Amino acid sequence: MEDRTPVTFYVGLHDLFVRLIERYPGKPIVIATPLHRLGETCINGECKPKEVGTLLDYVQAIRRVAEHYSLPVLDLFAVSGLQPSIDMLREKYMPDGLHPNDAGHRILAQKIIAFLETC
């Protein structure tokens, strides 16, 4: 499943998920993707793809590896409703373009609770 050379994000995900499964057998394990952020297609200030990838690349890796281990994914990247590239949403929920404020956390809490109730 994708690149498993020793220093890749994929290796880290596989290692983490296997360790969680082995440490907590029979317990529910859920995975969440990161939220959108302002400048998410940029890496180190440069808005062009680099060798390490974009935030979406990391989100897709999380989705793929979690699916490989049959772990449920709360895809906040896809369903949070928090998109800081929209000025009104950023001002109301993520003023710094990355971290949700109290109102943003209330939205996330509702999403998380609803997701956990289905697991």
Where are these regions (language model features)?
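Alpha-helical cap/lid subdomain in secreted, periplasmic
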Residues: 1-119
